[in-house]
Amino acid sequence: MEPQVTLNVTFKNETQSFLVSDPENTTWADVEAMVKVSFDLNTIQIKYLDEENEEISINSQGEYEEALKMANIKQGNQLQMQVHEGCHVVDEVLPQTVVEKQATARTGKKPLAHYSSLVRVLGSDMKTTEEPTAEARSPVPCDTDKPQDKPPDWFTSYLEMFREQVVKETVEKLEQRLQEKLVLQKPPFSSSPSEVSMPISEEETLFLPENQFSWHIACSHCQKRIVGVRYQCSLCPSYNICEDCEAGPYSHDTNHILLKFRRPVVISSEPFFYSKYPTPRLPAALEQVRLQKQVDKNFVKAEKQRLRAEKKQRKAEVKELKKQLKLHRKIHLWNSIHGLQSPKSPLGRPESLLQSNTLMLPLQPCAPVMPTLSAAFVDENLPDGTHLQPGTKFIKHWRMKNTGNVKWSADTKLKFMWGNLTLASTEKKDVLVPCLKAGHIGVVSVEFIAPTLEGTYTLHWRLSHKGQQFGPRVWCSIIVDPFPSSESPVNLERDGISSSKADDFTCEQEEAFLLAEEEIPLGEVTKQTEGTGSSAPQKTQHAASERELYIPSVDLLTAQDLLSFELLDINIVQELERVPHNTPVDVTPRMSPLPHDSPLIEKPGLGRIQEESEGAGLKASPDSTVLTKRKAETPASVEETEEDLSGTQFVCETVIRSLTLDAAPDHNPPCRQRSPQRELQLYSTEEQQPLMLPGFCRKDSSLKFALPEEGPHGDEREEIVHIAEEEAIEEEDVQDEEVQSQSSASSEDYIIILPECFDTSRPLGDSMYSSALSQPGLERGAEGEPGIESGQEPAEARERLPERESQPKEQSISDILTTSQHLDTVPLVPEVAGLPAALSRSAPCGQYEAPRVDSPVTIQEVLPVPDHVRGEPRGSTGLANSRQKSCDHSRHHNGSSIAGGLVKGALSVAASAYKALFSGPPVTAQPVISEDQTAALMAHLFEMGFCDRQLNLRLLRKHNHNILQVVTELLQVNNNDWYSHRY
């Protein structure tokens, strides 16, 4: 939009300013008309001053636009204009005719008197039939067509005289005829006494004192006749107000511009008008009458337009009212039919109700309300991506809000749309929803069964009322985990548990996580029999429920639950997260948080322990040395033998053999046999706990709890220890080359050289759990403690428990692995084996030393805790007493083995999980660390690239010389420094 331009117009030392607010829509004709009206001029010539103060004429729209551009650019939106009055071409002989006839210029019709003046101007071009002399003399100027003959002067003067005479006579003739015509039309002016008096009275009213003009128009505001200045709306021609009303308040759109008129035309000098030509009074009266008629015509036309517009508006209002009435009828009809169709009232004829409603509709001015069906999603109980076990029964709840204005009835259902998830009842494609009123919130529930195959499953639903769908689409999306072999029906059936009960137990474990808010009490009765390997099936009593779903409390979960849910997923989560202190998110059931002093850092290659060729020191092929590969190479008969062991018994056997170190290497164990040349045995240091077996990482491996078998005696164990120490010293240099940094990528594989004397036919890590679960005074107390047979009843162990708790320094049985009475397996019974006093007393205390192979561990059944008392986390069901770090036998004499640190790092994740399951709060007792061991740890840290000696020493003291935690914190510090320097 162009800026506003101010026009400073000067005429005879009188200057007026005009503000052109919209130059684009203001034309030159508008400006010229405004100037004429403002200065009371008829013929004008407007000129503007350019930047050199030169006057330039404006006669067209293009010149006017050029002037505006110049004003915008060079004169600051100001345009100086000069107005010059144009010369009249009408002769002074008949000025009164021009004056009177120009009074009708704005009416659109010009009288004959004006054309008579044009005849005088045109001269000989006019040919009148009344003057034969003009016809006779007209051929005379035809001789002037010859360009070579110039007319003489006398001829030219004669023609001018003739022209004036012809024009004068023609005008007089026309005026005479006009006067005769007016006399014949005298009846309209019959109110006047005579022909002469009427024009006089009209003249008196036409020219009032002070040179004011009477418009014979009523003011649109005060309804009086306008005399003098008249203001007419530029947009509404029918709106006219007088000068007094314009000065005060008036009812009209303030945005409309009012045009000011003093008189229709410029009034000439009156004395000359009256003295010389008194006769043209009749034409003046005629013009006044015609003006009034034109004004009346315009007024009538405007009034008709106004009435027409009002009529259209009334029609539109009537149409809108009819539409609203029709809408009211539909609404009442729908409500009446809906009310009659309710089950409480029989269906009747709504004609009478409709008629009564239609009669009363005009009396109800309420706004129309359309019946709308709408819903909004509020909340759900199972978020997308929830992990479930195959065959799990669960119920998905959606909280929905009725956001419409129609109450949900029995016809409102949750309709199945599409999906691949299995319904508990395949016939129920439409689920009933609660009858919610408008604005209320309810719960819509659907029962599902997790498919047997792993994968992601989704099912979509939408609300529907009588076949009309509405509201948002809701869905249930779950992730079905693969069926672990430890819980497969085949293995459980071979252990004496039917496949159906195994599936139910899996479902029950899942329900504890999915529907914990709808817990159903569970009573479990476990029958325990004497013996080392016999177990009775677990008997569960389900509470009465229509859905037959078992929803146990979290506190009722047993060690089997913890092992099957916690340990199986540790390695998988570590591969995904690779962050310390990271707890598995989607693992079910919920677990207590792990201690912060044992972060989850693990290499996924721990399950693939490779073997190095003895002679050349070269690495063997990873595919040929993976433990799981070796299992596949064994004969089918051996596999069948191994499958007799369930997954939980396998884990239990591993843990028990790690704790009860009185068992000798069994060369005919129930698990897979391996050749002596390829036997490997993991070992741990003081902080090392359970090793993550390949079965924990691979979902097709089997885990099974089993009771300990007869082991070697003390002399055999002592011999094994010495052999292991000698070979560890010899191969330390070879292992040093194989050591990987604790902070390296998680995809690395470790190659660990172990002595051949280690029996790998048994579960991995015979003693890896012992050091973390035994007391420092274990060896001292073991000497005087008599052995307890493996078949001892749990009651005897319960009697011994208070005594041991009251005398922690004198007990010979250390921390106890407690298996809840809810397990299907036979309860673990305490078993104590003797140890040579010389060996136990000579064992030096050290945290980073080779693992004990000969420390006795007592397994004891603790008193069962009543269900109503169980409110502590699951970790509290593990050991009765808090653990302390023990003193171990050293495999090397002058420093800790790098291989020991490597194995400790490899077993860190399993240790953390085991501590979370079976240990209490960490003990603050710090073992004595020698300077040589500290120096070895410092050298190990330098090898890893951590060369800040002061920081290393400070972190070693902070973490009790736990190199794993030191490396973890160093990595975190380095990462933080990298981020701070980068950003």
Curated annotation (Swiss-Prot):
Phosphorylated by GSK3A; this phosphorylation inhibits NBR1 involvement in the formation of ubiquitinated protein aggregates. Residues 126-149, 611-645, 768-813, 867-894 are annotated as: Disordered. The modification Phosphoserine is found at S117, S592, S598, S855. GO terms for biological process: macroautophagy; negative regulation of osteoblast differentiation; regulation of bone mineralization; regulation of stress-activated MAPK cascade. Residues 930-974 form the UBA domain. Keywords: Cytoplasm, Cytoplasmic vesicle, Lysosome, Metal-binding, Phosphoprotein, Ubl conjugation, Zinc, Zinc-finger. A zinc finger (ZZ-type) spans 214-266. One of its GO terms (molecular function) is zinc ion binding. The PB1 domain mediates interaction with SQSTM1. Ubiquitin-binding autophagy adapter that participates in different processes including host defense or intracellular homeostasis. Possesses a double function during the selective autophagy by acting as a shuttle bringing ubiquitinated proteins to autophagosomes and also by participating in the formation of protein aggregates. Plays a role in the regulation of the innate immune response by modulating type I interferon production and targeting ubiquitinated IRF3 for autophagic degradation. This is Next to BRCA1 gene 1 protein. It comes from Rattus norvegicus. The gene is Nbr1.
